[in-house]
Amino acid sequence: MASLSLAPVNIFKAGADEERAETARLSSFIGAIAIGDLVKSTLGPKGMDKILLSSGRDASLMVTNDGATILKNIGVDNPAAKVLVDMSRVQDDEVGDGTTSVTVLAAELLREAESLIAKKIHPQTIIAGWREATKAARQALLNSAVDHGSDEVKFRQDLMNIAGTTLSSKLLTHHKDHFTKLAVEAVLRLKGSGNLEAIHVIKKLGGSLADSYLDEGFLLDKKIGVNQPKRIENAKILIANTGMDTDKIKIFGSRVRVDSTAKVAEIEHAEKEKMKEKVERILKHGINCFINRQLIYNYPEQLFGAAGVMAIEHADFVGVERLALVTGGEIASTFDHPELVKLGSCKLIEEVMIGEDKLIHFSGVALGEACTIVLRGATQQILDEAERSLHDALCVLAQTVKDSRTVYGGGCSEMLMAHAVTQLASRTPGKEAVAMESYAKALRMLPTIIADNAGYDSADLVAQLRAAHSEGKTTAGLDMKEGTIGDMSVLGITESFQVKRQVLLSAAEAAEVILRVDNIIKAAPRKRVPDHHPC
């Protein structure tokens, strides 16, 4: 019986696209490595910045070296590249820093995997080797961690060092000492809660970054109404989200016809009476400050002024949410049951000037740890980047307060982990040892890139660093001020254990996910169905 020769059958819809085997794997590697190459020049204390220009009606300009911000604002089409973008976003959400490191490490792992697959080593063999290497690296990192949580003086110094290390690679590096102090003082005010919502950051154009300061209490970027008290002590605050205009007729297309101007006056009088009744219901709460998410129109503003109540309108939603948190109040929208409404409180509300702008200052708030950091700067781009840099430092410090373990930076931890993985590879038989060696090489690429970005001879420096760790100098790292190998414990270059651990695990998992891919299927674009119905 003659054998039948079956032609390949296409099971996908017309327009669908499929990449198989080596083509799919190569496509994934190229996309991931390209993302790593894009952000690696921003790594380290001498990293460069990127300018991001958005097109369209609301075209904006952004100058940043924050890995998560860069990746979030570029559009990527490659599936593997999207995996790395999502991974950097998770890193930013989880620990706040290490977004560039995690992306670069994952890309370097895949670069090594590409050369191993070219040598006919199976992806599953590589993954098995990587998993053992990750365990060894994590254990080495754990063994090197130092915990000063029980010693208040040393722990504060650790926090100062961590904030300084985080800010070294940011725009704020030239004012590092000033912002390190601001960030540490703000986080220590939280008393271990780690609730960063209590730290409010306000950006005000003018002055220089060195003019930025930490303010006790809460600042609201609004003005007090006309003919209202400008200062209130022992404030009782009602925070609301309610319309302070008369209720409009809600029937679509409805109209009111009158046959005389007297009738118009009657309608206006009825509206005023209705608003007066609403204001009286609000005043029954026994308050001396009313803050509304929506507008407060002229008539109710006059009524509040006559009653000696400070009225603040159109407070932004985030500001209102945070104000409710720090004053201990709740946002109300109905006022029929005053006994059920939780009022906010603070010792003093007053109007203050920052630059040329008036703001409202709440001091002695119920949440004692609340504070505001006021950022000053010459341009909006500088202020935005300063806020991102400060956010990273605050997130890392909040993590360190929860888990006080620290490790050394400057490529020290990466070289320590690479040394442990290399030792494991030398004791491991078979092809998995080759995968472990590639893992160690990827880890060593991080100090290599840091040295390259600073303009130093990376081959020489990394060789010296590797030799130092082989001799048992476990605190040796890169000193990018002098371009030499230095003792990180003496230089105070410290990083959070949680950040380093998250970088290691996230990069290994993301690289493994991409390495497992052997097929990429793109769905057919959805076709628009013409509408033949008459209008």
Swiss-Prot record:
Modified residues (N6-acetyllysine): K13, K154, K181
CDD domains per the UniProt record, alphabetical: TCP1_beta
Binding-site residues, ATP: G44, G98, T99, T100, E495, K500
PROSITE patterns assigned to the protein according to its UniProt record, in alphabetical order: TCP1_1, TCP1_2, TCP1_3
Subcellular location: Cytoplasm
Cross-link Glycyl lysine isopeptide (Lys-Gly) (interchain with G-Cter in SUMO2) placement: K248
Modified-residue entries (Phosphoserine), positions: S3, S60, S260
GO terms classed as biological process: binding of sperm to zona pellucida; chaperone mediated protein folding independent of cofactor; chaperone-mediated protein complex assembly; positive regulation of telomerase RNA localization to Cajal body; positive regulation of telomere maintenance via telomerase; protein folding; protein stabilization; scaRNA localization to Cajal body
Protein name, per record: T-complex protein 1 subunit beta
Higher taxonomy: Eukaryota, Metazoa, Chordata, Craniata, Vertebrata
